[in-house]
Design a protein with these regions (language model features):
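Sec-dependent bacterial lipoprotein signal peptides
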Residues: 1-16
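Cell-envelope and extracellular/periplasmic
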Residues: 23-24, 33-57, 61, 83-87, ...
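Phosphate/oxyanion-binding active-site loops and adjacent basic polyanion-contact surfaces
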Residues: 51-56, 112-120, 162-171
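Substrate-binding cleft of extracellular glycoside hydrolase catalytic domains
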Residues: 78-136, 140-142, 155-162
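Bacterial Sec-dependent N-terminal signal peptides
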Residues: 12-37, 361
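Terminal, contiguous helix-loop blocks that mediate binding/assembly
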Residues: 26, 125, 129, 144-146, ...
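Loop/turn elements at helix/coil->beta-strand transitions in domains of secreted/extracellular proteins
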Residues: 36-39, 72-78, 131-137, 179-184, ...
Length: 382
């Protein structure tokens, strides 16, 4: 039921259609790039042996459902990069005309390496060519495994899939090399709403939209929230509200979402550096900090940031008040069903605290205890 474990096989012919509509198709003109105010790049890389390819296709169908309901994309465009296998990927433009969506396959890639800064930058350059716009945003649909490095020698976490992982530092560098800072980056993946990720991406985007914990296989309810994401001024509060409402009524009612204003990550880093000088975390109190990975990692790697600050500050009420006020600016919008789930742990967990971001500073997990010290966040705060 999670973004980690789905195996559904769909024919790639779906990419050339509009979700199974058998009505006669009117002759169409070749796609010609036209500049708009906004463009959203949907990046769906190969997800490996535990493929969620079928789920990603359903996500695209849900996006089209939202577009049809709103009778178009407004001042926005959508361009999709989706990998059907380890070797084959497609660049697809989603358009709207006469009450229907249309998918134009603009390019097919064979063995394209999108895991390097150069590969990412080159792909984003193609995005600019095919969808010229004043503002760009990204939606990323794949697996996410927290900030844990794809190799123990790497300093940051990865996303994508086990076969072709993408390191967040390479992703960040690729965006910067392309010269197209995103309005928002939405990770439709597990474990991506962490302070380590947010700090790494502070120059790549204005906002981070992600989940602190595991994401159900259904993913983001795009048929509900896409209209807010395509708006000239995205309604982040509505995104969180409709996400929470959807999952509260879903068959697997587990979910978290948060919007992080990356402009405040530097201020939070400076605050944490100061507090780490004057305060020491008592490991005997680690069980008092809210766990957000529910035994996916044992011992826990992902703790709630607000909960950690409460325990770290202890009886220092003024410092804790300052911390919570800053956290409210850093995470202006968030939502949760009140319960999270772990495929590995095979059980739900009630949330007693939820700030919208995780932190791994107190983790004693053998895989994290040294690698966390190599992240840009740790170096900025210790």
């Amino acid at each position: 039921m999670l973004k980690h474990f789905f195996l559904l096989l769909f024919s790639i012919i779906v990419l050339a259609s509009c979700g199974g509509n058998d009505d006669p198709v009117d002759p169409v003109e070749p796609f010609v790039p036209t500049k708009t105010k906004n463009a959203v790049f949907v990046f769906m890389p190969y997800t490996g042996y535990n493929s969620i390819y079928g789920c990603l296709l359903k996500n695209l169908d849900d996006m089209e459902q939202a577009i049809v309901k709103e009778k178009g994309l407004g001042n926005s465009q959508i361009l999709v990069f989706i990998s059907e296998s380890m070797k084959t990927s497609h660049l697809v433009k989603i358009g709207y005309n006469k009450g229907k969506c249309r998918r134009d396959t603009l390019n097919t890639y064979t063995n394209y390496d999108y895991t390097t800064p150069d590969g990412i930058a080159s792909l984003l350059t193609s995005v600019k060519q095919w969808t010229p716009a004043d503002n760009y945003s990204m939606i990323i649909g794949c697996h996410g495994e927290g900030w844990m490095p794809k190799k123990q020698t790497k300093q940051t976490r990865y996303f994508g899939g086990t076969a072709i992982p993408i390191d967040i530092s390479d992703f960040n560098e690729g965006i910067k090399n392309a010269g197209m800072k995103m309005n928002y980056i939405l990770f439709d993946d597990c474990y991506m709403s962490g302070i380590e990720v947010a700090y790494q991406l502070r120059e790549a985007a204005n906002y981070l939209i992600a989940s602190t914990s595991e994401m159900m296989g259904y993913g983001m309810p795009y048929h509900k929230i896409l209209k807010y994401l395509l708006a000239d001024n995205p309604d982040y509060e509505a995104v969180c509200s409709d996400f929470t409402s959807f999952y509260n009524n879903f068959s697997m009612p587990y979910g978290t979402i948060a919007v992080t204003d990356l402009a405040y990550t530097e201020e939070m880093a400076s605050f944490m550096k100061a507090i780490n000088i004057t305060h020491t975390f008592d490991l005997d109190k680690i069980d008092d900090v809210q766990d957000l990975d529910v035994e996916h990692f044992t011992p826990t790697v992902y703790f709630d940031l607000g909960s950690y600050l409460r325990v770290l500050c202890g009886d220092d009420a003024p410092t804790y008040t300052e911390a919570t006020n800053l956290l409210k600016k850093l995470v202006p919008y968030k939502g949760t069903t009140g319960m999270i789930y772990s495929w590995t742990g095979r059980k739900p967990l009630e949330l007693k605290e939820y700030s919208g971001l995780t932190i791994s500073d107190p983790s004693i997990n053998a895989k994290a205890v040294e690698t966390k010290k190599q992240t840009t966040w740790w170096n900025a705060t210790h």
